[in-house]
Regions:
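Basic/aromatic-rich interaction segments and small domains that mediate binding to polyanionic partners
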Residues: 2-61
Length: 61
């Protein structure tokens, strides 16, 4: 189950970011299976926030 601050990996290319990009969930949508993900660069610095549906991301353990 996803919740705020869950670490995730993207499964699709979106808004110029490749699949496999790592980030954290910063906001869950109440109206559907989607969330805002803060994407990180290779040094774990935040670079952007992008909306993903739950089937476009997976939890990183």
């Amino acid at each position: 189950m996803l919740e705020d601050y869950t670490k995730v990996k993207t499964l699709v290319e979106k808004d110029g970011f490749p699949s496999g990009t790592i980030g954290i969930v910063v906001s869950l949508y109440e109206n559907g299976p989607a969330c805002e993900v803060e994407l990180w660069d290779s040094d774990s610095n935040p670079i952007d926030v992008v909306t993903y549906t739950f089937d476009e991301i997976e939890v990183v353990l």
